[in-house]
Structure formats: structure tokens, C-alpha cells
């Protein structure tokens, strides 16, 4: 008879609903601090356990792989109501382990398909203000790394990345990348890179529309930063952007600017070999441009001897045939350049 009274195992949807109820309670208890502390602690322990259970369903463990049907049920219930919004806003109330678990849950859910559809993308499109919340999370020292991870996973969806690129949020990353907290600055840099490289057509459209202010800020705030790490990351990312075929129109305009060329020539003179090599990969685009404006060609001619001496000293630590071939081609081009009449 005892077996008749055993509680039914909770379904994935049950666990999501319980999590949602506990998140509601957590919000309420913060609004009403008079609620009994022991009761609150008990509920927060339950909430942490529920979030851990969600993670277990989505990721499995050492003994069992995740079950596709259970993951689909969980995902469907999670995005049916405002569970994501409640989880994000309640994150500061959780302990560190629960925050980590919640971050992993949100990250995983961005990849979960239900009936061959990423329903997280549909939810975020209808609740796009959550991206405003996540971006501003970089300013919260305790929460930045959690919100940053979630933000990167959310911009896997092209519609979400487009919203961020079309907003004023992009400008905030020039500041976040240089925050004094090294871990947060590095996380912001990783996020900025993801935003500018993942969705090729969306990024190309953004750069064409915003190239004037974007590259002016990129040059002054990142490439000319006093911070070595910022300069190193920025010149590497610039190379990734300009060498991508999707951005060929933007690249052609970038390498037609005297101001841009001066900045690159300064980076070639850096004491850091890493920065020199990354700068070379962008500098070679100025030299290789078959339709150089006269002022660009004339600067290269006027500085020919200095540039050739500089290039002779730039060598990667490991033998790199491709780099050597590129450098030889650049040296030949510079050696053969002639002064032109300015248009």
C-alpha cells in the first residue's frame, strides 16, 4: 500500500514552474524585508536546487546524457512565460553557485530546438528589452561575468545581434573594454568581438551604415589607447574585420584614409612584436590596394626607407612561410612606388 502514496516524479515542466514560483517569491521577499528570514532562506535553498535540476536536465551528468524530449519540454515551458526575465532580474539575489548554474541554463537554452525551431530567438525578439538589461549588466562588478556570458549566447541569434548593433549599445563597449577590472574588460572584449564577427551580413550592413563614427572611435579609443592589452586586442580584431570578404567595401574605404594609415604606421613601430605583426596584417592592405589615393601613395614613398627598415625587423617567433611571402610582396610594392600628383 505504501507505494500508492509515493509522490509522482516531477516533470521538466514542473521544475520550470516551481523555479518560476520561487523566483516570484524571491522578488517579493526583497520588496518586503519583514518576511521571516528563516522562511526566506529555506525558499532560496529550494530555488538554488531547482536551478541545479534544470541544469542537470539540460547538460546531463557523468552517469547520464541529456534526454532530448526532456530538454524540449523544459525549453517550451521556460519560454512560455517570463521565466527568463525573472531569472535575470533575480540573479543578484542568488548565491554564487546558483548564479553559475543559472548562467549555464540560460546559455544552453539559446541552443535548444523545439520542433526544429530555436524558440529562445522568438522569445527574445518579443522581449528585446532584456538585451538592454544584459548590456548594462557589464557595469555591475559582481554580475558582469554572468550577464556577459548570457549576452554572448543571446547574440547567437541574428535578430538579437542586429538589435544590439542598431542600438546605441555598441558605443558602450568602447568603455567596457577598458574597465579597470581585468576579467570584466576581457569579457567585454570577447563579447565585442563576437558581436562584430559572428553574423557576417548583419555586421557588414552595420559597418557600411556607421563606418565614419565607428572607425573614428575605434581608432581613438582602442588603437590609440594607453593600455597595451586594449591596443593588442583591437588591432587583432581590426584585422579580422577588414580581412573578412563580407566587409570588402568597408575595407576599401578604410585603407583609403591617411589618418588610418598614420595610426597603422605608428603601431608598426610598437615595441611589442605581437602588435607589430597584427598591425602588419592590416598595413599590407594599404600597400596592396591597387587604387591607392595619391596622398596614401605619397606617404608610403616619403617614408619608404623607414618602412623598409622597420619591416626587415618584423619577424614572427615561429617560421611562417605565408607571413614571409606577404612581407616580401609588401616590400616589393613599397620599393616600386613612385610619387604621384595630388588630385
Curated annotation (Swiss-Prot):
Q: Which SUPFAM superfamilies match?
A: ARM repeat
Pfam family membership, one = Mo25
Q: Which InterPro entries match?
A: ARM-like, ARM-type_fold, Mo25
What cellular component GO annotations does this protein have?
Answer: cytosol
Protein family: Belongs to the Mo25 family.
Q: Name the chain's protein.
A: Putative MO25-like protein At4g17270
* Organism expressing this protein natively: Arabidopsis thaliana
Amino acid at each position: 500500500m505504501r507505494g500508492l502514496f509515493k509522490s509522482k516524479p516531477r516533470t521538466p515542466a514542473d521544475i520550470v514552474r516551481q523555479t518560476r514560483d520561487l523566483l516570484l517569491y524571491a522578488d517579493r521577499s526583497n520588496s518586503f524585508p519583514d518576511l521571516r528570514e528563516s522562511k526566506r532562506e529555506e525558499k532560496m535553498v529550494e530555488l538554488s536546487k531547482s536551478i541545479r535540476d534544470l541544469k542537470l536536465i539540460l547538460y546531463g551528468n557523468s552517469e547520464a546524457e541529456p534526454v532530448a524530449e526532456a530538454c524540449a519540454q523544459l525549453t517550451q515551458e521556460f519560454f512560455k512565460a517570463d521565466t527568463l526575465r525573472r531569472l535575470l532580474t533575480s540573479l543578484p539575489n542568488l548565491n554564487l553557485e546558483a548564479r553559475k548554474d543559472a548562467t549555464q541554463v540560460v546559455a544552453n537554452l539559446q541552443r535548444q530546438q523545439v520542433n526544429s525551431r530555436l524558440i529562445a530567438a522568438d522569445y527574445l525578439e518579443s522581449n528585446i528589452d532584456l538585451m538592454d538589461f544584459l548590456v548594462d549588466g557589464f557595469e555591475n562588478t559582481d554580475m558582469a561575468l554572468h550577464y556577459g556570458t548570457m549576452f554572448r549566447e543571446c547574440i547567437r541569434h541574428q535578430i538579437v545581434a542586429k538589435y544590439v548593433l542598431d542600438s546605441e549599445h555598441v558605443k558602450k563597449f568602447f568603455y567596457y573594454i577598458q574597465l579597470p577590472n581585468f576579467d570584466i574588460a576581457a569579457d567585454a572584449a570577447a563579447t565585442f568581438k563576437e558581436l562584430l564577427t559572428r553574423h557576417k551580413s548583419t555586421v557588414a550592413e552595420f559597418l557600411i551604415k556607421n563606418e565614419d563614427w565607428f572607425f573614428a572611435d575605434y581608432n581613438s579609443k582602442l588603437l590609440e589607447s594607453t593600455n597595451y592589452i586594449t591596443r593588442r586586442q583591437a588591432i587583432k580584431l581590426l584585422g579580422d574585420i577588414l580581412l573578412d570578404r563580407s566587409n570588402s567595401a568597408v575595407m576599401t574605404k578604410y585603407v583609403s584614409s591617411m589618418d588610418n594609415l598614420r595610426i597603422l604606421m605608428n603601431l608598426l613601430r610598437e615595441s611589442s612584436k605581437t602588435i607589430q605583426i597584427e598591425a602588419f596584417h592590416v598595413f599590407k592592405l594599404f600597400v596592396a590596394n591597387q587604387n591607392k589615393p595619391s596622398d596614401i601613395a605619397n606617404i608610403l614613398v616619403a617614408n619608404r626607407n623607414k618602412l623598409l627598415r622597420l619591416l626587415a625587423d618584423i619577424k614572427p617567433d615561429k617560421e611562417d612561410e605565408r607571413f614571409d611571402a606577404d612581407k616580401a610582396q609588401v616590400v616589393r610594392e613599397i620599393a616600386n612606388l613612385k610619387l604621384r600628383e595630388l588630385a
